[in-house]
């Protein structure tokens, strides 16, 4: 339908529209709005999952008779640092390639005492370890912790080489916690932890 408007009607219509729009705006600004209160959600960092292996554990010293002809160097040419180095048997090469950082999972208090295992004597010497050496090919499913033969421990009132005090421990759980560049081998436990953080 066609509606004819006179000039005066046009002015009145414009005024009406302006009033309607203004009224709607005022109504919107004075009408209380309902806002849903949302509690902030705290993001929990995802815990890393670690690969574990159950192995035998022994210890060695960087001295002739326990290593090859270069006791001051590991099989990959790294300095034989008793603070961070561990060796592994050849059959574990795929699971624990050089540069893998492992931790020894503490024994449960309910674990029966193994008379051939002296973990309790050297526990504070282990820390984190970098796989940086290899063992005799005949040995299987074993990690070998490099320890300082001069840092003696007390066993039954007698001072002993820590590698001998450890003996052989069976069913030891180790956990892979990272990997580092063996060409930038840390020198201390503190440096190793820092290198591990930077590699993540």
Describe each model-derived feature in a short phrase.
Residues 18-24:
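Single-pass alpha-helical transmembrane signal-anchor segments in small membrane proteins across taxa
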Residues 1-5:
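Juxtamembrane low-complexity tails/linkers enriched in Ser/Thr-Pro and polybasic
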Residues 6-9, 16, 27-200:
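Solvent-exposed, well-ordered loop and adjacent helix/strand elements within mature globular domains
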């Amino acid at each position: 339908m066609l509606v004819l408007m006179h000039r005066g009607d046009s002015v009145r219509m414009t005024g009406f529209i302006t009033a309607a729009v203004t009224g709607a705006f005022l109504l919107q600004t004075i009408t209380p709005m309902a806002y849903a209160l949302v509690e902030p959600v705290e993001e929990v960092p995802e815990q890393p999952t670690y690969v574990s292996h159950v192995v035998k554990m022994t210890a060695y010293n960087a001295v002739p008779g326990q290593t090859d002809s270069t006791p001051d160097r590991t099989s990959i040419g790294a300095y034989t640092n008793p603070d961070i180095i561990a060796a592994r048997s050849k059959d574990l090469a795929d699971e624990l390639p050089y540069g893998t950082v492992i931790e020894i999972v503490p024994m449960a208090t309910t674990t029966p005492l193994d008379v051939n295992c002296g973990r309790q004597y050297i526990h504070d010497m282990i820390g984190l370890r970098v796989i940086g050496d290899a063992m005799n090919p005949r040995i299987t499913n074993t990690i070998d912790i490099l320890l300082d033969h001069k840092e003696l421990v007390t066993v039954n009132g007698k001072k002993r080489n820590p590698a001998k005090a450890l003996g052989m421990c069976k069913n030891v759980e180790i956990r892979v916690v990272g990997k580092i560049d063996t060409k930038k081998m840390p020198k201390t436990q503190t440096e190793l932890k820092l290198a591990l953080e930077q590699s993540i």
